[in-house]
């Protein structure tokens, strides 16, 4: 049965549950999977930047003729800031009947909203979602039931159990030598480095596009140096797929998604790709991961991945978190690691997430709907700009995992609200009259959340004192770049800032210990990316993507040694460190390639001094 579950006959009181992300024709609606741990599922979002998007539709099997009551799970996304009817309005038609209810613009949480009733014959019925505004209306699922009182659970475990009962999942099982979760730059490099050593690798990514924040979905350019002492061949592989042009919030072609995909597909003898699969569950016992379970964000297929070793390249430390790995989040107190720049008291402050955007020049004056949902812009508080990149940053005072939908939504809201003010309220707006929004990210670029703890935690003291460790590996070259709410923005939006400033602590290039790249209490878990074993301050230098790519390359090398010796990550440090050093000296990239990664290098530092052996 296609795209929707046919359950038993209506006389039983059961119905038909249709997951919106399963819709066969999505029209202009997009699949958004970023918040499944918060609200339970991927969903469809009508991200039209104020212009209604095309209809999404699918066909479902109706088990028996009769009247069906239609419920839609949706969310009024501006409700945290405004009591007004929200902007994300849409309607639904079922079996050719346009139902009267306007959905998605009332309430204050994810909930089942009643759309109306439709008389349906036995057989096939078409369901269509009609966006009315282009302002990010969202649909999680549609429930057709002969019993008007049979409303599914609102959320949580009860809703998950309901879904699994109505639409049971079949689990496909696969086995590999090495499973990498997260298809950003770190995960790409980890998987390819391992595959080039003959390791059978699975690479899982929860988006259809590879590259993470450097993809055309988020549009953050690469940063940091490659080819640095003590291992000057580390990072060569980034020259194989790294975009040739820099810049944040640029047109999609700048980010060369096809080149990234080709880089991965070239390793198909040893590397299997699983785009659009999101890890939701981990089987971990006695500090050892046996399997991870990933579900396709559109079809709902679940795959069990078994392997001796895994790498968490998710950014959020999702695999480690689900496995029970030790982790940190927020700022450590000064006493914890004796870092001179740490606050006296630790807190939950993190760097935020960016919803980047730009506008384009039109041939004639263009309009934009009035968008006013709780943010009171005026001539002093508005941002008189035609684009927004990294400084547009939200959620620094909120939990970047548990509250991320609100954080992303606030990023959308400030873009729309500010643009609305420039177009509709600002008197001297000649600069904006002939401009319209050309791109607004709905996949937010996150900088910081969980940091999984390894046998070594990189601290500010390591960096400023240039402490040399025997397992020195990839070299970080960026300054200690930390973000904080912009004081000017705080004057107008205290506690709800959406602009940031940064501080740059100058450090020399520093070779980070390998022991930062595996978990201290999950014995077969590597990590690469912004979720490695560092303090909040340490994260400030290692988090840029050329640097995370080199982390991944080292992890892939270590995974090859684990496979060869039937070893665990810690044993590479204790028993096989010389072999790892030999691999790092050689690198896993193709030799002889010109360095085409010379933009956004960052780092104001003296001449690098090679560490003494």
PLM-predicted stretches and their roles:
Residues 193, 199-200, 205-281, 285, ...:
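Conserved N-terminal/central alpha/beta ligand/cofactor-binding core
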Residues 172-184:
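Beta1/beta-strand and adjacent pyrophosphate-binding region of the FAD-binding site
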Residues 4-5:
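C-terminal motif of bacterial Sec signal peptides marking the signal peptidase cleavage site
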Residues 265-268, 292, 297:
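Active-site neighborhood of glycoside hydrolase catalytic domains
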Residues 187:
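N-terminal Rossmann-fold NAD(P) dinucleotide-binding loop
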Residues 10-171:
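Extracytoplasmic
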Residues 168-172, 213, 275-276, 288-291, ...:
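Flavin (FAD/FMN)-binding glycine-rich loop and adjacent Rossmann-like elements that form
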């Amino acid at each position: 049965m296609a795209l929707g579950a046919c359950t038993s006959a209506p006389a039983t009181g059961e119905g038909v549950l249709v997951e919106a992300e399963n819709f066969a024709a999505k029209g202009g609606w997009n699949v958004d999977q970023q918040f499944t741990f918060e609200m339970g599922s991927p969903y469809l979002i009508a991200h039209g930047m104020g212009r209604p998007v095309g209809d999404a539709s699918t066909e479902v099997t109706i088990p028996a003729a009769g009247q069906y009551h239609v419920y839609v799970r949706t969310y009024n996304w501006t409700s945290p800031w405004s009591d007004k009817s929200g902007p994300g309005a849409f309607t639904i038609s079922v079996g050719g009947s346009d139902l009267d209810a306007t959905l998605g613009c009332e309430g204050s949480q994810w909930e089942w909203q009643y759309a109306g009733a439709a008389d349906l014959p036995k057989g096939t019925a078409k369901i269509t979602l009609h966006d009315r505004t282009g302002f990010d209306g969202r649909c999680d699922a549609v429930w057709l039931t002969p019993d008007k009182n049979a409303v599914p659970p609102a959320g949580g475990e009860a809703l998950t159990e309901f879904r699994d009962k109505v639409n049971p999942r079949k689990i496909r099982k696969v086995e590999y030598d090495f499973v990498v979760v997260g298809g950003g730059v770190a995960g790409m490099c980890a998987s390819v480095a391992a595959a080039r050593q003959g390791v059978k690798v699975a690479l899982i990514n929860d988006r259809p596009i590879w590259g993470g924040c450097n993809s055309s979905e988020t549009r953050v350019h690469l940063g940091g140096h490659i080819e640095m002492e003590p291992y000057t061949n580390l990072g060569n592989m980034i020259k194989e797929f790294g975009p040739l042009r820099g810049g944040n919030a640029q047109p999609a072609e700048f980010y060369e998604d096809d080149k990234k995909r080709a880089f991965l597909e070239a390793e198909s003898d040893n590397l299997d790709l699983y785009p659009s699969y999101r890890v939701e569950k981990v089987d971990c016992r006695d500090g050892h991961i046996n399997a991870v379970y990933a579900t396709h964000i559109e079809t709902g297929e679940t795959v069990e991945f078994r392997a001796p070793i895994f790498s968490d390249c998710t950014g959020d430390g999702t695999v480690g978190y689900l496995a029970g790995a030790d982790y940190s989040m927020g700022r450590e107190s000064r006493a914890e690691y004796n870092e001179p720049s740490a606050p006296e008291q630790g807190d939950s402050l993190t760097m935020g997430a960016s919803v980047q955007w730009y506008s384009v020049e039109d041939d004639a004056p263009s309009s934009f709907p009035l968008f006013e949902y709780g943010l009171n812009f005026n001539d002093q508080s508005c941002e008189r700009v035609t684009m927004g990149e990294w400084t547009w940053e939200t959620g620094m005072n909120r939990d970047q995992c548990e509250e991320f939908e609100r954080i992303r939504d606030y990023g959308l809201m400030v873009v729309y609200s500010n643009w609305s003010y420039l177009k509709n309220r600002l008197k001297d707006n000649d600069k904006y009259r002939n401009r319209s929004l050309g791109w607004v990210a709905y996949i937010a670029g996150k900088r910081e959340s969980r940091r999984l703890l390894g046998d070594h935690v990189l601290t500010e003291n390591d960096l400023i004192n240039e402490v040399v460790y025997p397992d020195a590996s990839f070299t970080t070259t960026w300054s200690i770049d930390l973000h904080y709410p912009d004081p000017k923005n705080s004057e107008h939006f205290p506690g709800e800032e959406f602009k940031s400033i940064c501080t740059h602590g100058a450090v020399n290039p520093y070779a980070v210990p390998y022991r930062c790249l595996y978990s201290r209490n999950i014995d077969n878990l590597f990590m690469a990316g912004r979720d490695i074993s560092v303090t909040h301050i340490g994260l400030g230098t290692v988090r840029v993507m050329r640097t995370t790519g080199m982390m991944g390359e080292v992890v892939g090398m270590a995974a090859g040694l684990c496979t060869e010796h039937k070893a665990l990550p810690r044993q590479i440090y204790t028993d096989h460190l010389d072999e790892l050093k030999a691999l790092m000296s050689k690198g896993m990239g193709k030799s002889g390639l010109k360095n085409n990664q010379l933009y956004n290098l960052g780092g104001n530092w003296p001449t690098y001094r090679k560490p003494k052996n």
